[in-house]
Each structure stands twice: as C-alpha cells, then as structure tokens.
Amino acid sequence: MEKHLPLIVNGQIISTEENRFEISFEEKKVKIDSFNNLHLTQMVNHDYLNDLNINNIINFLYTTGQRWKSEEYSRRRAYIRSLITYLGYSPQMAKLEANWIAMILCSKSALYDIIDTELGSTHIQDEWLPQGECYVRAFPKGRTMHLLAGNVPLSGVTSILRGILTRNQCIVRMSASDPFTAHALAMSFIDVDPNHPISRSISVLYWPHASDTTLAEELLSHMDAVVAWGGRDAIDWAVKHSPSHIDVLKFGPKKSFTVLDHPADLEEAASGVAHDICFYDQNACFSTQNIYFSGDKYEEFKLKLVEKLNLYQEVLPKSKQSFDDEALFSMTRLECQFSGLKVISEPENNWMIIESEPGVEYNHPLSRCVYVHKINKVDDVVQYIEKHQTQTISFYPWESSKKYRDAFAAKGVERIVESGMNNIFRAGGAHDAMRPLQRLVRFVSHERPYNFTTKDVSVEIEQTRFLEEDKFLVFVP
C-alpha cells in the first residue's frame, strides 16, 4: 500500500513527481514531494498575516473546525484512515484525535482566552494600547519554522495554531512518525478557502534527518522564530542551524507522574490514573509513567487500577506495536521479575504494572507500562522531581495539590493537574514553563513625548535644561 502527500507551499498544492522522499510503515509506504530552491524563494518572499485582525483569524479557524466536527467530512475520514492504516492507531484512538482537532478549532472562547492571558489583551495585536507611559502593540515575528514530532499529533496542531494566532507565516516540517496531521490541517484550510490569507500563509514540507539537509538549513537561516519539538537530537539540530539572534522555542523530552494522597474514592482515583497512562500510550511528555501512592488502601487501589486499565483497552484500545516495541515490553517484564520486583501484566501485553521502591526503575518501554511506588508521605516525592525534566504532576485528590504545589514548583515541576486531566492544557496555563505566544510576537513600544509628566516627576523632561542648570537631583523622587 502506498500513499502520496504533495508539497504545500504558501497554500499551493505542488506535486513534483521527482525526488520524492519515502517513509515506510512496515510494508506500507508514504511518498512526499521534496522542496527545491524555487520553493524556498517563494516561502522566504511571502507576506505575513499583518492585515488580518484577531476576529478574522478565529472565525476562519472556527469555520474550519465545523468541517472537522462533521463525521462525513472527507478530509477527516481520510485522516482517520491514515492514522489507523499507517500509524497503527485503534479506530477509537484515531477518531478521538480528529474529534480533538474539531474541539480545538471550534473553541472560539478558549482561543480568545489564550491570546488574552498570554499577550495581556486580545486587542494588542490589532491596535496600540496605552500601557504605563507608552503605547504598546504586538507584531508577528514573521517567518516561523515548526519542526514537529510525531508522538503527539495534537502538538503539531497546537504549534501551527499558535503561529496563526500571532499572525505569523508557518513553515512546517512534518515528522516521519506522523506525516498526516499537519498536512491534513493545512489541506482543510485550503478546503475552506484556498485564497484566504491563513491558507496562503502555510507551507508543509518534509526532509529526512539522515539526508542532505543543506537546503533545509538554508531555509532555517531565514526564519524569525523556530518551534522545535522532539528528542534531544532534533532540538540540538534546530539550535545549531537557527540564526543566533532568533528565539528557538524548545519542546523537548519530559517525564510526568501521578501522586495519590490517601485517596478515599478508589474508583475515581483509578479511572483518572488509567486515563493518564493510556492516552497516547504514554508517548506524550504529560503521560504518567510513575505512580506515588501514600495511604492505607494500596492493595485495593492496585486491583481497581487493573480493572480500569482493562476498561481502557475496550474504550480506547492500545495502538498496534512494532516487533521491537513488543520485544522491549516483554524484556522489561522479564528483567523486573528477575530483579525481584512484583509485576502484574496482561497476557496480550496491553498493559503492565511494576511495583518497586521509590527511585527504583529499570527500562521503561512506555506502551501502558507504569511503575507504582508506595511512599510514607507525599513530601517524599520532591526528591524525584528533576528541574527541566519533570513536566506534569497529576494529583488525586485535587485538593491535596494545594498543600504541595509550592514545594513541587520550587523544585522544578512545570505543571500540576488533577488526575485524569493531563492531556487537557487549560487556557491561561504555561507550557514547559513558558508563555509560547509571547515568544512569537515582537512587542513594540511607542513612548510618550517629553511633555508627558510621570507619576514620579511632575514636570516636563527637559534634559538639556537639567544639564545646564545641574538640577537633575532635584527631580529624583
């Protein structure tokens, strides 16, 4: 089986018929057209979205989202088929991914709130706002490169939407492990209106990291901001080849875990933990890989967790695993058993629970494997937090998180959520300890003239006169 994905350059669909890159998914193949110097020139010379106001942008995204909301939308149906056929997603998981794309695009209020909380105002990109002794306005950085990872398809959607919400041109490098999501999103914009400035502002490309990346490096040298997702090698490549004067937003590998503090409702606690383990099969930075349990219902909780992991295998089945992934999963089980750890696993390798002392962890194969650690008190967890490495801590009960959030945050945790909510990034929250939209705009200040008196100095700022009369200190508050 073979699928062809054409280039998208400034919203134009281009098939080159030559120099196509090939990505293999076992016996299935995806062929993607390569870009050349002409395409590079076209992208570099393209305008941004300066003439669009925020209402125009969000209304267009909403219109696109309404298409994704329809289960009869051909682009959505093709996308779901690709996730199942090529990436091994279960039908339920693939459908959920498409549903989330619809949800994100259609959530107009959330999009406005994201701009408001991250940039300070929904109007700051459309007009000059008085702030202190200045007028301030946010302008797009310009050309933004989005180097996507394939472990979490929605991260690519999020990255592109951040670029659009800040009125930037988006040049997207698809991931070899998911060449479908960014491409389908861009094509859905074209479906709505091929001549819309948003459609024309997006390019979707691909190049293998192992190939000659000279042209890709040249393209990167023209960027005004780079958003890099993925492993350390991908992040290092982006930093190495980006211009030294621009921002590189780095979303690298992170680890997350769950803290259970004397849970009273074991049914609810186990449901939340199972969700945080099973969503994306632990391939996301926010996925729970370890559970720290404080309380006297430890054995009962484990039984409930087994029940909920089996439930999730029905409602959100695990994606198809490669031979290597299956082998690593089995080897981890054998290694832990040989080391004397207690292992609870499912005959078909659909999930695995490993019990160990806090801090004891062998290989982690992901794929719905979780280490469970019995602790005396929640304060003991602080020592296992690694600054710049620990992203999300899921708490149950949520009220317990208020007691420990200061200590956990001071140690380096970047995000604290209720158990069962790790995949939902609330509007207003930070992402990897930053406000990404702030780094995708240029804040320009138009400062008041000399005769504008300040709160501290109630006279006109006549600096030449101050020097002539040597009266500077008179005006120091």
UniProtKB/Swiss-Prot annotation:
Family annotation (Gene3D superfamilies): Aldehyde Dehydrogenase, Chain A, domain 1, Aldehyde Dehydrogenase, Chain A, domain 2
One GO MF term: acyl-CoA dehydrogenase activity
Coiled-coil residue windows: none
E.C. no: 1.2.1.50
Catalytic reaction(s) noted: a long-chain fatty aldehyde + NADP(+) + CoA = a long-chain fatty acyl-CoA + NADPH + H(+)
Pfam family, one: LuxC
Functional pathway: Lipid metabolism; fatty acid reduction for biolumincescence
Superkingdom of origin organism: Bacteria
UniProt keywords, alphabetically: Luminescence, NADP, Oxidoreductase
InterPro entries in alphabetical order: Ald_DH/histidinol_DH, Ald_DH_C, Ald_DH_N, CoA_reduct_LuxC
GO biological process: one example: bioluminescence
Entry's family note: Belongs to the LuxC family.
Function per UniProt: LuxC is the fatty acid reductase enzyme responsible for synthesis of the aldehyde substrate for the luminescent reaction catalyzed by luciferase.
Designated name of the protein: Long-chain acyl-protein thioester reductase
